């Protein structure tokens, strides 16, 4: 019978979020008999094929890497079955696992999901947590089932959201917490606890983030816009237009100074601070980036754009 560190584990993950759990498994000496990650994708201006971060790490450690387009084909499922995994660990893999795959490992498929399930099921739970204005973020370690993040949960862990948290900052914290939870659960094999069924009446979903979501609607509140700045950093970013050019807001804070600004109206305040009106309160822009330029502080931007005071953004 398999015990800790003798377990044969197939790891499935693709982005930065998945690196920390994989590193932790390697540090504990687990037998990673295969790493599944998404195919290389074109990236950058040259559109050259770029490997997922997990592939790079796996190859550095001499692990076998597999990049199928899908796991729905019987031949892919048969190959995975030949690896004879005791456990499959999933961390932001990005491909759907059919029931035939879920049935392969002896102790099931464990999924590290960075939200407090059943809240924020779906593809981008960290961004959803920031958009929701939650005080707490969290990780759920669940047994994967055929439904979208509907499987029973072994454990949950919470962390307070800080004002400076962006999606990558918060995701890094949750990846570490999730890795610790994973190691704790693996240490209990073969006597795994009974996972708790989710309350589907409390479920919420958040799908893929699109570029269009980054466009600022100044008819919303400063609080909501600032949440989007943190949730959509670094991609797609939050942006508006100024002089027919895209203006990205890299960092901002909601204020309530009573300046009487109309939505999208800019006020250079105290000579070097930039306030923009919204449906409720002012948005203070801390850092920004004009199309074709490097990012800079609001003070530096104002010095180079003498006509910024009084303009309306996004028109």
From Swiss-Prot:
Function of the protein: Attaches a formyl group to the free amino group of methionyl-tRNA(fMet). The formyl group appears to play a dual role in the initiator identity of N-formylmethionyl-tRNA by promoting its recognition by IF2 and preventing the misappropriation of this tRNA by the elongation apparatus.
Gene coding for it: fmt
Family: Belongs to the Fmt family.
Keywords: Protein biosynthesis, Transferase
Xref: Gene3D superfamilies: 3.40.50.12230
Top-level division of the source organism's lineage: Bacteria
Record flagged with keyword Transferase: yes
Cross-referenced Pfam families: Formyl_trans_C (PF02911), Formyl_trans_N (PF00551)
HAMAP family noted in UniProt: Formyl_trans (MF_00182)
Catalysed reactions listed for this entry: L-methionyl-tRNA(fMet) + (6R)-10-formyltetrahydrofolate = N-formyl-L-methionyl-tRNA(fMet) + (6S)-5,6,7,8-tetrahydrofolate + H(+)
Binding site for (6S)-5,6,7,8-tetrahydrofolate: 115-118
EC number(s) stated in the UniProt entry for this protein: 2.1.2.9
Matching InterPro entries: Fmt (IPR005794), Formyl_trans_C (IPR005793), Formyl_transf_N (IPR002376), Formyl_transf_N_sf (IPR036477), Formyl_transferase-like_C_sf (IPR011034), Met-tRNA-FMT_C (IPR044135), Met-tRNA-FMT_N (IPR041711)
Regions crossing the membrane: none
GO molecular function, one term: methionyl-tRNA formyltransferase activity
UniProt-recorded name of the protein: Methionyl-tRNA formyltransferase
EC class: transferase
GO-annotated cellular components: cytosol
């Amino acid at each position: 019978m398999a015990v800790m560190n003798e377990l044969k584990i197939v790891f499935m993950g693709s982005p930065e979020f998945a690196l920390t759990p994989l590193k932790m498994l390697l540090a504990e000496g687990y037998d990673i008999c295969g790493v599944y990650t998404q195919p290389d994708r074109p990236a950058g201006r040259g559109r050259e094929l770029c490997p997922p971060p997990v592939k790079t790490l796996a190859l550095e450690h001499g692990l076998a890497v597999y990049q199928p387009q899908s796991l729905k084909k019987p031949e892919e499922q048969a190959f995975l079955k030949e690896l004879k995994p005791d456990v499959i660990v999933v961390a932001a893999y990005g491909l759907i696992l059919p029931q035939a795959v879920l049935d392969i490992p002896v102790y099931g498929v464990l999924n590290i999901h960075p939200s407090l399930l059943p809240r924020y099921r779906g593809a981008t739970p960290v961004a959803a947590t920031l958009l929701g204005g939650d005080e707490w973020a969290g990780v759920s370690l669940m047994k994967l089932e055929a439904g979208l993040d509907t499987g029973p949960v072994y454990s949950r862990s919470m962390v307070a959201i800080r004002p400076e948290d962006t999606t990558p900052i918060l995701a890094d914290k949750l990846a570490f917490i999730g890795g610790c939870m994973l190691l704790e659960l693996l240490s209990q094999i073969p006597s795994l606890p009974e996972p708790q069924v989710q309350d589907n009446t409390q479920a919420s979903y958040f799908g893929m983030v699109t570029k269009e979501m980054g466009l600022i609607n100044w008819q919303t509140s400063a609080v909501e816009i600032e949440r989007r700045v943190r949730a959509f950093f670094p991609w797609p970013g939050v942006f508006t237009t100024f002089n027919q050019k895209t203006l990205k807001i890299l960092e901002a804070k909601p204020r309530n100074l009573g300046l009487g600004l109309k939505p999208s109206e800019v006020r250079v305040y105290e000579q070097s601070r930039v306030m923009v009106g919204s449906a409720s309160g002012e948005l203070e822009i801390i850092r920004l980036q004009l199309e074709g330029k490097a990012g800079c502080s609001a003070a530096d931007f104002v010095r180079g754009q003498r006509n910024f005071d009084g303009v309306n953004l996004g028109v």
